[in-house]
């Protein structure tokens, strides 16, 4: 939505507006989610003494029984609300999807001041724990998808997380200095 895109265009002099813009963007997504054909639940994932905001998205027209599920992590400046659209086709194909503002992203960054961290297997494990705790999720069919910066974090999570059955690491760039 426009509030999300306005964040990209803010100058350093307008830094104080980021939290307000984020909150409006989040409010817009949550209002639209109520109209979505598949259920989108607002959830929190606990990790140590921190809580991360996110969404558990139900598949559209799910088959009977437990659902396969994917944890979808966005890049360095991504919001859970914006990456929903990149994963929507998984919902259409019968997968559940967990979107979480892990450290350094979305509400963790803008509303809670939680910065990113190098040991991403820790928040990654907390997210997988949450997914597997859901009775409708098939614990034997859990995948992780990381895009952009999370395309680097996702393999680290997978290296420590043996419950994952699939990994997609869609990294941003190979060498940022070469790509500039």
Label each region the model flagged:
Residues 90-107:
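Conserved alpha/beta-hydrolase
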Residues 14, 18-65:
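N-terminal cap/lid segment of alpha/beta-hydrolase-fold proteins
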Residues 146-150, 154:
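Gly/Ala-rich beta-loop-alpha elbow adjacent to hydrolase catalytic centers
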Residues 159-180:
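Hydrolase active-site cap/lid region
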Residues 101, 141-143, 166-168:
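Residue in the alpha/beta-hydrolase core beta-strand immediately N-terminal to the catalytic nucleophile
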Residues 114-140, 156:
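Alpha/beta-hydrolase active-site loop
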Residues 67, 72-78:
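Active-site glycine-rich loops that stabilize anionic/oxyanionic intermediates
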């Amino acid at each position: 939505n426009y509030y999300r895109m306005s964040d990209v265009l803010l100058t350093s002099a307008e830094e104080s507006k980021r939290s307000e813009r984020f909150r409006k963007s989040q409010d817009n997504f949550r209002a639209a989610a109520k109209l979505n054909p598949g259920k989108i639940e607002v959830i929190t994932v606990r990790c140590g003494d921190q809580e991360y905001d996110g969404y558990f998205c139900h598949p559209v027209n799910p088959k009977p029984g437990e659902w396969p599920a994917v944890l979808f992590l966005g890049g360095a400046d991504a919001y859970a609300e914006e990456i929903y659209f990149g994963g929507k086709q998984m919902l259409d194909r019968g997968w559940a999807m967990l979107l979480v503002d892990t450290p350094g992203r979305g509400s963790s960054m803008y509303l809670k001041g939680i910065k990113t961290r190098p040991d991403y297997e820790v928040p990654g494990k907390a997210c997988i724990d949450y997914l597997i705790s859901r009775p409708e999720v098939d614990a034997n069919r859990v995948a992780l998808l990381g895009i952009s910066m999370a395309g680097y974090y996702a393999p680290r999570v997978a290296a420590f997380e043996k419950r994952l059955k699939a990994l997609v690491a869609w990294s941003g760039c190979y060498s940022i200095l070469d790509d500039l």
